């Protein structure tokens, strides 16, 4: 009897897969009971081993400490808040749709719980693959009177906000607070007297400008007052503590800068200035913008990013000590009054221990919706993809495009950590003449491993940033595709397999580019046609092993 629960381990025909899904539905109670028994046995016998295997080379170490970066992925321009016992984070994602909302119980282990938006209907160029580097720049998230607020600017279109009573969503449709170009990095602030403000910088970094804002956060009430000018001042985050207004900003540039605290008894200044975090003798270059949170235990913490090439801008967590009403971030190793980033530290004291986790990656495509980890490159064409056309498969209909950069409906997610193995299973039954489909690494350089249908048959191919390598004819109706990512050496290997056991490299090792258009290299699934709008690629599953918490690759 075939194993009807053997999901995604090898070849399954589309018809067999749907039979298996129905079988799983019919035997759900039976399966659940078996799983409970196995889970209890597993916990009793091997919980210690599980802990050792779950910890990765970054994040939670399962011994009361963490290793930076706590999020070793391109969560650029992070902002974080605490509401009750939970922490929430948002980040910029530019031309990728849309903006993820993450949740943590301890500032170290994070999972994706929602998306603020799924498309940008503010310029037709987001539909035509012409807004690389546009979209959402550095956002801020705040909580005020029972409601979550997210603000961000796009470089060309304006200042936008969205609200939700539940950070997992639904979020309100994007509201245009101001139609303008050249603004960046907004942050709202509601003072204790009820007056609302919004601070921001201008494209190119600086100056810092403060506006009065309506209490509902939808309208700016004046033209703004410049409160600070400094070297590449950006990333405005506003706080109030012990009678001081604080503006926390990065200065000096993404790669070589530092973190600055400004403080004043008036929100309009004048502001005192102090550098509070610098690279020092560490290898954490340019510690950049982020957010501060306070804990009930009395601790304070700062989440910020570091730019690290092809992996993008990864998130570090620093302890914060308040000295004479100034924040000292990290550890002052040389006693110069300025903190330096920590590489490993005791986890925040939140009063409890929580399970290890990392943002979602793998997907079986068996649900009714895409996993929250997925983001389309530019706006999706919604009638050209489906999880329902063939149940248990992601179906991507091909549209005409000359190459991957201009192809619509490329589905991507973030690289996790420096080492990773990404594998997918692609079916060819509905592919059309001229169609290309497969697995890509999308960045400044674009690399593909996939299938192309020609007059003479279907061939496996690799595209190493424009260097095309055509492999053998594929006569079966499916192929396993794999990318082995090694960011320690900044390259990836493209492979394919007929049986998910023996993988063959096609072409030379690929050199991965540094982050491009402000975003890191991303794995993705693609389907486009160089001749016509026709053909469908069916992806059975997407599996991702990485070197982080619960990543399975250590």
Spans of features found by a protein language model:
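Bacterial Sec-dependent N-terminal signal peptides
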Residues: 1-4, 8-14, 19-50
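Carbohydrate-active catalytic/glycan-binding domains of CAZyme proteins
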Residues: 48-554
């Amino acid at each position: 009897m075939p194993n009807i629960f053997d999901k995604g381990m090898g070849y399954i025909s589309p018809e067999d897969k749907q039979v298996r899904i129905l079988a799983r539905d019919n035997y759900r109670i039976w399966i659940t009971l078996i799983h409970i028994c196995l889970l209890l046995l597993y916990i009793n016998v091997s919980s210690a081993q599980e802990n050792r295997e779950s910890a990765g080379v970054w994040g939670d170490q399962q011994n009361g400490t963490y290793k930076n970066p706590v999020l070793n992925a391109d969560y650029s321009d992070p902002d974080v808040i605490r509401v009750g016992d939970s922490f929430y984070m948002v980040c910029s994602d530019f031309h990728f749709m849309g903006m993820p909302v993450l949740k943590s119980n301890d500032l170290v282990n994070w999972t994706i719980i929602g998306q603020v938006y799924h498309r940008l209907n503010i310029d037709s160029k987001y539909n035509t693959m012409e807004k690389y580097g546009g979209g959402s720049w550095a956002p801020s998230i705040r909580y005020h009177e029972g409601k979550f607020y997210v603000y961000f600017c796009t470089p060309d279109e304006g200042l936008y906000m969205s609200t939700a009573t539940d950070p997992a969503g639904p979020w309100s449709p994007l509201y245009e607070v101001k139609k303008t170009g050249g603004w960046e990095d907004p942050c709202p602030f509601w003072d204790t007297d009820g007056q609302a403000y919004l601070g921001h910088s201008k494209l190119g970094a600086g100056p810092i400008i403060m506006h009065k804002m309506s209490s509902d956060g939808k309208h700016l009430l004046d033209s703004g007052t410049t409160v600070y000018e400094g070297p590449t001042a950006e990333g405005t985050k506003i706080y109030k503590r012990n009678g001081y207004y604080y503006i926390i900003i990065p200065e000096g540039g993404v790669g070589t800068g530092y973190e600055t605290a400004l403080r004043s008894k008036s929100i309009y200044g004048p502001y005192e200035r102090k550098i509070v975090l610098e690279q020092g003798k560490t290898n954490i270059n340019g510690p950049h913008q982020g957010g501060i949170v306070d804990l009930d235990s009395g601790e304070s913490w700062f989440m910020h990013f570091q730019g690290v090439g092809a992996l993008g801008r990864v998130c570090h967590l620093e302890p914060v000590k308040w000295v004479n009403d100034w924040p000292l971030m990290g550890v002052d190793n040389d006693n110069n009054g300025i903190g330096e980033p920590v590489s490993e530290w005791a986890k925040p004291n939140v009063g409890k221990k929580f399970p290890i986790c990392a943002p979602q990656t793998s997907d079986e495509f068996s649900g009714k919706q895409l996993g929250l980890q997925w983001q389309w490159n530019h706006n999706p064409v919604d009638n050209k993809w489906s999880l329902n056309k063939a149940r248990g498969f992601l179906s991507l209909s091909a549209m005409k495009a000359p190459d991957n950069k201009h192809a619509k409906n490329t589905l991507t997610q973030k690289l996790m950590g420096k080492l990773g193995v990404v594998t997918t299973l692609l079916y060819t039954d509905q592919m059309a003449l001229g169609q290309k489909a497969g697995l890509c690494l999308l960045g400044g350089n674009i690399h593909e491993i996939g299938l192309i249908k020609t007059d003479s048959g279907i061939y496996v191919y690799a595209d190493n940033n424009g260097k095309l390598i055509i492999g053998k004819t594929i006569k079966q109706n499916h192929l396993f595709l794999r990318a082995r990512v090694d960011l320690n050496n900044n390259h990836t290997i493209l492979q394919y397999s007929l049986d998910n056991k023996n993988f063959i490299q096609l072409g030379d090792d690929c050199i991965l580019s540094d982050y491009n258009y402000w975003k890191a290299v991303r794995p993705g699934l693609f389907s486009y046609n160089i001749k016509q709008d026709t053909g469908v690629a069916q992806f059975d599953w997407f599996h991702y092993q990485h070197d982080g918490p619960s990543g399975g690759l250590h």
